[in-house]
Amino acid sequence: MSNPLVPLRASRARRFGSAVAALLAGDALVHAVWATGLTWPADSARGLSYAVLNADVPFTPKVLLPLCALLGTAAASVYVHSHRVGGRRVRQAARLGTAAVAGGLALRASAGAVWITGVGVDVDAPFYWLNLVLYTPACVGFGYAAMRLAATPVEPSPETTTGEAPAREVTAREAAVARRRRARIGETLGG
């Protein structure tokens, strides 16, 4: 793995950001479905609660809808930061949101690592296996991606010519061609 504090290039930041934002948006969508009263994939609200949280917690709209809003805001923050959308202040706020996402995922991954050892969890319960196979690995991987994104500066990358939300990275050759064209236009207008 690379150093998590090394900033990402623009193209990789967009890929990482899209992946993390999609995970968070998908999580928000699943919680919105649960807020309707559906307990998929479990048979009951209690079974769902134990599979997801290893505790009996009410899966009611009062609990789930604020969580949906938080996850949606987190997804938007990561997407805005990674795709360099908006003005400088918007991007700074989005970077802070991305750092918060990284911190939250790191915290959940740490708790998951403890639960993998069997501390505070029944190793025969569905939660243990979901945590081992799905929850903790996802938090480690996406937390790493969010940490790398949070380390990526708000300023536009020097590899782009426009400085704002590039469609793709500009190659050195393309930049040289653009400079020559601008010079020719300047000569034409000036002379």
What do these predicted regions represent?
Residues 137-157:
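Membrane-water interface at the C-terminal end of transmembrane alpha helices
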Residues 1-16, 153-191:
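Actinobacteria-biased recognition of intrinsically disordered, low-complexity terminal regions
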Residues 17-35:
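N-terminal signal-anchor transmembrane alpha helix
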Residues 96-100, 124-142:
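Individual transmembrane alpha-helices with interfacial aromatic-anchor signatures
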Residues 111-122:
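Transmembrane alpha-helical segments of integral membrane proteins
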Residues 9, 78-100, 159, 163, ...:
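Cytoplasmic juxtamembrane regions at transmembrane-helix boundaries
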Residues 22, 29, 48-80, 103, ...:
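Core segments of alpha-helical transmembrane spans in multipass integral membrane proteins
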Residues 5-10, 30-63, 84-86, 123-124:
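Interfacial loop at the N-terminal end of multi-pass membrane proteins
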